[in-house]
């Protein structure tokens, strides 16, 4: 266990996790918490947001010992009655018959009475377990829309089309922002150099994008293709560009067999969505050093600004592969995520124990469906209440590329409502090109929606700075800001900080919606003034995003 303790120190986890000595293998602890009458709970995993708040009628099992649900997860639940439950380690959370039951692999499970409201409980938990770093991610994430080449180019990323994609955004009146170049820019997984067959002058491409006003991020993952030069170098020490054998001390990749004397002896072939590959062991200094060295080289050689870190799913670390450090799967996954802390312009999608940190976290891929549009809102609310202040929705219209292929059941109305939902939630991300998939009328709505977003951009930047100090979510539940009004189950609208109420249309074909107006005086986008608390009905023609500014 000395190796595990050393890893915790290396990762600078501080009080986020108990010393591994308190989590002996094979021993479990159980804690059951009875719900109070009318109590509501949030937490455990962002992906479960649509089922939140949990109450006496909930029947669910959330097992974050084996699955992170491809997003943020933590053994933390918080209630609107001022209570929270916390465990440093991963747990299985069963919610049934009006009770929460948490089971850990030995780590203590605490119930804390912190106050009387959701906000009081959250703030107390934040101070005790995931204090804010005081730092923000790159403020460019909040200052303008983001753009990702995934939907348009998928597995065919190339220099010419990337430049054309970026230029099309400017030509159609959208501002430059962060541009993410997605998977297959590289020669291979782990072979982190631009594919020379598709990128004649990658450094020149990045320079052109910079002159256009974009910041450039490259897609990265922790996998190493087992037929790449990188794999041969990491496993044998042979540099494929020469006959020189380099000094390699091992520890780069997860091992396949527990009985192997050294994990490097037989790297595991890990199945993921692009086949089978070796997986970098971030619990070993060599694995971390090699991966970070590749990132630093890309910045130095090509001038890129940061990275879109993908592929950090917990399930890749729960299959019995051998790591250098004898730590739980969550810490193995977290060790990869911690790489993001070295790069302020970085996006991540999976997180355990990284609440309070200056990392932009994206929601898991959403489908091109109305149900998943609604799920974007509930998951953003849930992730914020797990302690992730800087959350980005998935791509506008959804991140499942097959939905945008010719002949697919594309829904232009859904695309517009998705664009509106994202416009005022702090960050928005285009991938499918509006100029390809929409007609002229809907393209105009997109431009107007982005213009609206840009009017609020300075406020979003200031809100991000404030949340870096307080640890609070940028995007907030009504119950968080206005306790005692019965807002716990309102989850189709949200607040940005305490100043902006946003109520997007989330139903297909609907031309009006109900909006819950909390206490205060609110100036609506249509020029009316509404005094809360009250509930109103507002028209939602295709071009309207209902929002209310607090005075």
Residue ranges of predicted features:
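Bacterial N-terminal signal peptides
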Residues: 6-12
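Catalytic and substrate-binding clefts that recognize carbohydrates or anionic sugar/phosphate headgroups
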Residues: 14-140, 159-171, 481, 537-551
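Aromatic- and carboxylate-enriched substrate-binding clefts and catalytic-loop regions
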Residues: 53, 175-447, 479-482
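Generic recognition of flexible, low-complexity loop/linker segments
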Residues: 63-65, 72-74, 134-136, 167-169, ...
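Extracellular structured ligand-interaction cores
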Residues: 71-75, 80-82, 90, 144, ...
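Short, glycine-/Ser/Thr-/acidic-enriched flexible segments
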Residues: 83, 90-92, 152-153, 186, ...
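An acidic-aromatic substrate-binding cleft motif
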Residues: 125-156, 176, 183
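Carbohydrate-binding surfaces of carbohydrate-active enzymes
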Residues: 168, 172-173, 195, 208-215, ...
């Amino acid at each position: 266990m000395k190796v595990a303790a050393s890893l915790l120190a290396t990762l600078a986890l501080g009080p986020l996790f108990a010393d591994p000595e308190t989590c002996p293998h094979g021993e479990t602890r159980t804690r059951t918490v009875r719900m109070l009458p009318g109590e509501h709970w949030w937490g455990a995993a962002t992906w479960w947001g649509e089922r939140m708040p949990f109450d006496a009628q909930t029947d669910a099992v959330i097992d974050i010992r084996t699955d992170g649900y491809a997003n943020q997860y933590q053994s933390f639940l918080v209630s609107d009655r001022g209570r929270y439950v916390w465990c440093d380690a991963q747990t299985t959370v069963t919610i049934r018959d009006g009770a929460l039951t948490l089971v850990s692999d030995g780590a203590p499970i605490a119930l804390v009475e912190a106050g009387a409201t959701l906000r009081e409980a959250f703030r107390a938990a934040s101070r005790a377990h995931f204090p804010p770093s005081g730092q923000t991610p790159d403020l460019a994430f909040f200052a303008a829309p983001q753009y990702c080449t995934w939907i348009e180019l998928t597995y065919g990323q190339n220099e010419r089309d990337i430049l054309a994609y970026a230029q099309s955004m400017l030509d159609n009146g959208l501002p430059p922002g962060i541009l993410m170049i997605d998977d297959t820019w590289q020669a291979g997984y782990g072979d982190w150099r631009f594919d020379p067959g598709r990128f004649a002058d990658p450094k020149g491409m990045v320079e052109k994008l910079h002159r256009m006003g974009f910041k450039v991020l490259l897609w990265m993952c922790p996998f190493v293709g087992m037929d790449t030069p990188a794999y041969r170098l990491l496993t044998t020490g042979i540099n494929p560009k020469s006959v020189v054998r380099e000094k390699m001390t091992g520890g780069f990749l997860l091992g396949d067999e527990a009985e192997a004397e050294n994990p490097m002896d037989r790297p595991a072939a890990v199945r993921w969505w692009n086949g089978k590959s070796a997986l970098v062991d971030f619990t070993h200094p060599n694995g971390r050093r090699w991966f970070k060295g590749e990132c630093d080289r890309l910045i130095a050689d090509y001038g890129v600004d940061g990275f879109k870190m993908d592929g950090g799913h917990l399930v890749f670390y729960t299959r019995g592969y051998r790591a250098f450090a004898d730590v739980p799967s969550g810490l193995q996954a977290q060790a990869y995520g911690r790489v993001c802390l070295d790069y302020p312009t970085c996006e991540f999608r999976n997180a355990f124990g990284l609440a309070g940190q200056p990392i932009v976290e994206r929601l898991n891929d959403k489908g091109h469906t109305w149900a998943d549009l609604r799920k974007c809102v509930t998951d953003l609310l849930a992730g914020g209440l797990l302690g992730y202040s800087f959350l980005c929705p998935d791509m506008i219209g959804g991140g499942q590329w097959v939905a945008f292929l010719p002949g697919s059941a594309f829904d232009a109305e859904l695309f517009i409502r998705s664009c509106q939902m994202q416009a005022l939630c702090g960050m928005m991300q285009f991938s499918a090109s509006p100029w390809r998939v929409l007609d002229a009328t809907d393209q105009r709505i997109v431009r107007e929606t982005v213009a609206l977003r840009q009017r609020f951009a300075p406020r979003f930047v200031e809100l991000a700075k404030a949340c870096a100090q307080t640890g609070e979510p940028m995007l907030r539940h009504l119950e968080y800001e206005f306790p005692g009004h019965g807002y716990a189950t309102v989850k189709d609208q949200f607040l940005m900080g305490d100043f902006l109420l946003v109520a997007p249309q989330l139903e297909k074909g609907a031309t009006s919606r109900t909006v819950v107006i909390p206490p205060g005086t609110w100036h609506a986008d249509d020029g009316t003034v509404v005094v809360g608390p009250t509930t109103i009905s507002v028209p939602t023609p295709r071009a309207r995003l209902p929002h209310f500014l607090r005075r």
